[in-house]
Structure formats: structure tokens, C-alpha cells
């Protein structure tokens, strides 16, 4: 017998086979993502009632993302005993949300200078991914947090949620999907890590080893 149905397509067009999110159950609440904008939702598991939602503001980076429909879930951590939901967006931002209210965590990350973004609780992952990458360092243009990486240089996004381990939020990424790649070179898919309490950058694992790293 079906107890209740939660309509994910209330948060954007139905995405058929591409909707792959696995809900996470923590302290009596279900958490998931839904829709092309990867809206985060907290759900009462007894009734199916939506307790809160968060949807990232529109950006050019989101419009260009090839992983809009591929959000697979969220991660959970704690800051001084306070439950925190971590998720990565198709535009490649890391968000830290209060598990009870859905509001962004104070003192985490840095302000993203884009309309609609909160003053705190967000990390622009592109900044750290591009840092020390030679093609970007040679690119004679200022960084635009709305536009992201120029197509001439590459493309990067993410579909998987981060993981939280030993006080660290670890973030992966995704390049172009499928077997029909459009470029020979792309942004390296390096793994990024951040402090779970502050959002401060901790380390980067180079998938393509740099001199002296092998």
C-alpha cells in the first residue's frame, strides 16, 4: 500500500530516466534533490510533506551545464553539533545548508558576487579548480563567476554529491557526458577538499600528476 507520493516534477520538468537521486534519511527527515536546477528538498517521511526547499539562482554556468538532470543526492555533516546538508550544483558551486531550516550556514565559504546568492554558505568551486592550471593562468581575461570557464578552455560540472569525512568535504566533478566528446583537452578533473566548518580550501588532488607528485 502506497503511503504517500512526493512529486519531484513540481520542481522542474520530469526528467524520466535521468532522475537518479537517492534520498538520505537523517534524524527523522528525508533529503533529496529534484529537477533541472537540482532543488534541494527536506521531506517528512511520515507524511510526504515538503519541509523546506532551496534552489540556486540562475547563472550562465547553469544554462551551459551538461549535468542539469543528474543530481544524485546530498551529503550530511555537522558543525558544532548542528546538522548541515552539503550539495553541489550543476553550475559547480558547493552549498552548506542548515538541515532543519534550509538556510545557508553562517561563516561558511565566501560571498559569491551574483544576484540572488546568499552572503555566506557557498563556495565557488571553479576558483580553486582553475588555480594553478596553466591554460587558465595564460588566459588574459578576468574571472567571471556568472560565466565560469570559457568554452575555448574547457567544461566542468558535477553530478555526484560531495562526501564528508574526518572534518573534510570532498568534491568530485564531471566533464562532458557520453562517448561523443567535443574537445581533445579539458579542465583537469582534480578532486577538491574543504574544511567542513568554514568552507576553507584544504587541498587538491591532481588526477594528472604534477612533477614530483608520482
Predicted features by range, described:
Residues 5-6, 41, 46, 175, ...:
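N-terminal export/assembly segments and adjacent metallocofactor-ligating motifs
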Residues 47, 91, 97-102, 186-201:
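Beta-propeller blade signature
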Residues 16-39, 65-93, 154-181, 188-190:
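Repeat-blade elements of multi-bladed beta-propeller folds
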Amino acid at each position: 500500500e502506497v503511503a504517500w507520493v512526493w512529486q519531484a516534477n513540481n520542481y522542474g520538468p520530469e526528467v524520466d530516466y535521468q532522475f537518479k537521486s537517492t534520498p538520505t534519511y537523517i534524524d527523522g527527515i528525508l533529503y533529496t534533490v529534484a529537477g533541472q536546477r537540482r532543488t534541494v528538498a527536506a521531506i517528512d517521511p511520515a507524511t510526504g510533506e515538503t519541509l523546506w526547499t532551496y534552489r540556486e539562482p540562475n547563472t550562465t554556468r547553469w544554462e551551459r551545464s551538461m549535468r542539469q538532470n543528474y543530481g544524485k543526492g546530498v551529503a550530511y555533516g555537522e558543525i558544532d553539533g548542528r546538522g548541515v546538508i552539503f550539495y553541489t550544483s550543476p553550475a559547480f558551486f558547493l552549498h552548506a545548508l542548515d538541515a532543519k531550516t534550509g538556510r545557508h550556514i553562517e561563516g561558511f565559504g565566501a560571498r559569491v558576487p551574483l544576484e540572488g546568492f546568499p552572503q555566506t554558505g557557498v563556495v565557488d568551486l571553479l576558483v580553486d579548480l582553475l588555480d594553478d592550471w596553466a591554460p587558465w593562468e595564460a588566459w588574459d581575461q578576468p574571472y567571471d563567476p556568472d560565466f565560469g570557464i570559457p568554452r575555448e578552455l574547457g567544461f566542468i560540472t558535477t553530478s555526484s554529491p560531495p562526501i564528508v569525512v574526518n572534518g573534510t568535504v570532498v568534491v568530485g566533478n564531471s566533464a562532458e557526458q557520453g562517448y561523443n566528446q567535443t574537445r581533445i583537452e579539458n579542465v583537469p578533473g582534480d578532486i577538491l577538499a574543504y574544511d567542513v566548518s568554514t568552507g576553507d580550501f584544504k587541498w587538491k588532488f591532481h588526477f594528472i600528476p604534477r612533477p614530483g607528485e608520482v
